[in-house]
């Protein structure tokens, strides 16, 4: 008995001593403490103040220093190598909401460089397609076979002579690579899986319900076909018409806009001033030119970053030159590449601050956004309660296969200024949703003074996604919408008001025509 009491006393005294020592060490900062899970800070998605999960302890944690982006890591993200699984948030909505339409803009997939660096060997890349070569995809062989039936489809005349598959064993300049094809087979398949439970396109879809358009470049046409095949494998060619967009801005008959051109010229002058003032960039170009035995201005004109990105994305060593008559020799380096990429990232930061590009982007993308809004309105009208749907239906799926010079201004015009520059095979998705109709017993919304009570038909909402991420509440027209007030999605009317009126306020104008043709003060 006595021994047991002594043992218990020893345990109590020992525990107390350990507690005192632990508290003393924490007080002296010898043991780091970590906040509990519900107090641990995190980065807000939009770069704002982090919000703690769980109950608020009313404690403020200093935000850690945000490191400068790593130019090389950013470049690998730009490559978008299809070697990992990807989470896509397309097709997500509150229960019982109906998906009415989807409009997608894609940037073409990985391509061969548009420029070559003088005195260096061009990167050796095979642009034919083979399932035995990586990267590959289960749909690659069926896709190749299906493209052989493309003569059954309908093509706008400028596209009829464009090859439907990349086909050169030694890639031509700007040609889509097998990586680019696989990127878009994956993209299309991702959306097919996201929407298959929503019955977006019935099995007996009509030609009127699908709209596919592309610029005249083979890389955009082939990217669009790969995406569409991933989305709708073994589709019926006889139902498909592929339409040509002559402008990379997809502006149709509304491309004439003098003010847009002025803003673009001012933006290009800003870019030039920033480049020539960057002494590190200038030193790097001089070093690279000396290595290759070139004049610095000749190297600049060759836009070496385009070719170097191709080497990086395909795991090919950077170009080297043997000793020549000029005595120059050596290889271009990752450090030199990083300097050029760093300057490009700096340019993106200044571009957002100055605002010239955003003005250009709004005018450049208004025709496309207005067409997007019109399509949504037609689909919404076709789905009104008690209305007889139009014979053949409305366009419920639109695919626009475009370039970086299309998607970058689109992101800016939407107010997504913090979005990363469009990588290879980037995608922007617009989803139109309809809430369930009010049922008997649910209270109706009160009408305004002198107005009629609102019909029981469901309300319309919009989602915007960029590379699978829901960015709706980062857009200009929905940033201030309170999604916790029983409306978890962005009302379509916000988007319509923005496109028809609000986006021209920055020009003190009320319409696209006025903003485009008003004489500068």
Residue ranges and their predicted role:
Residues 2-211, 215-398, 402-521:
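Signature for phosphate-centric chemistry
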């Amino acid at each position: 008995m006595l021994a047991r009491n002594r043992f218990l006393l020893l345990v109590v005294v020992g525990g107390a001593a350990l507690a005192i020592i632990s508290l003393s060490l924490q007080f002296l900062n010898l043991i780091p403490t970590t906040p509990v899970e519900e107090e641990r800070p995190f980065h807000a998605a939009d770069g704002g103040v982090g919000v703690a999960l769980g109950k608020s302890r009313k404690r403020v944690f200093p935000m850690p220093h945000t490191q400068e982006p790593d130019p090389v890591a950013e470049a690998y993200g730009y490559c978008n190598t299809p070697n990992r699984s990807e989470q896509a948030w397309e097709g997500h909505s509150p229960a019982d909401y109906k998906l009415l339409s989807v409009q997608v803009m894609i940037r073409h997939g990985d391509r061969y460089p548009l420029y070559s660096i003088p005195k260096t060997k061009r990167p050796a890349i095979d642009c034919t397609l083979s399932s035995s070569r990586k990267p590959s995809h289960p749909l690659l062989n069926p896709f190749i076979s299906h493209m052989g039936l493309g003569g059954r489809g309908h093509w706008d005349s400028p596209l009829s002579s464009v090859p439907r598959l990349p086909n050169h064993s030694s890639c031509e300049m700007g040609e889509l690579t097998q990586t680019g094809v696989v990127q878009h087979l994956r993209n299309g398949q991702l959306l097919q899986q996201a929407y298959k439970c929503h019955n977006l396109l019935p099995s007996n879809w009509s030609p009127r319900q699908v709209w596919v358009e592309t610029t005249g470049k083979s890389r955009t046409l082939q990217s669009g076909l790969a995406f569409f095949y991933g989305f709708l494998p073994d589709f019926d060619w006889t139902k498909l018409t592929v339409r040509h967009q002559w402008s990379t801005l997809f502006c149709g008959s509304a491309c004439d806009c003098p003010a847009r051109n002025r803003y673009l010229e001012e933006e290009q002058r800003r870019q030039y001033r920033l480049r020539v003032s960057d002494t590190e960039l200038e030193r790097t170009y001089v070093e690279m030119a000396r290595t290759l035995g070139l004049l610095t201005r000749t190297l600049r004109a060759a836009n070496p970053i385009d070719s170097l990105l191709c080497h990086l994305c395909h795991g090919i060593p950077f170009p080297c030159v043997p000793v020549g008559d000029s005595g120059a020799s050596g290889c271009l380096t990752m450090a030199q590449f990083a300097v050029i990429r760093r300057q490009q990232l700096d340019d993106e930061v200044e571009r957002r601050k100055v605002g010239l590009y955003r003005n250009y982007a709004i005018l450049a993308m208004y025709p496309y956004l207005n067409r997007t809004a019109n399509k949504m309105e037609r689909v919404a009208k076709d789905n009104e309660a008690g209305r007889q749907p139009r014979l053949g239906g409305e366009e419920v799926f639109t695919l626009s296969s475009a370039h970086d010079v299309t998607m970058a201004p689109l992101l800016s015009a939407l107010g997504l200024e913090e979005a990363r520059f469009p990588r290879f095979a980037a995608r922007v998705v617009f989803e139109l949703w309809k809430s369930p109709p009010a049922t008997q017993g649910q209270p109706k919304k009160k009408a305004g003074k002198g107005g009629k009570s609102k019909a029981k038909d469901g309300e319309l909402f919009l989602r915007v996604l960029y590379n699978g991420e829901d960015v709706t509440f980062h857009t200009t027209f929905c940033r201030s919408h309170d999604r916790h007030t029983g409306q978890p999605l962005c009302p379509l009317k916000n988007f319509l008001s923005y496109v028809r009126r609000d986006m021209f306020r920055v020009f003190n104008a009320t319409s696209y025509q006025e903003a485009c043709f008003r004489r500068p003060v």
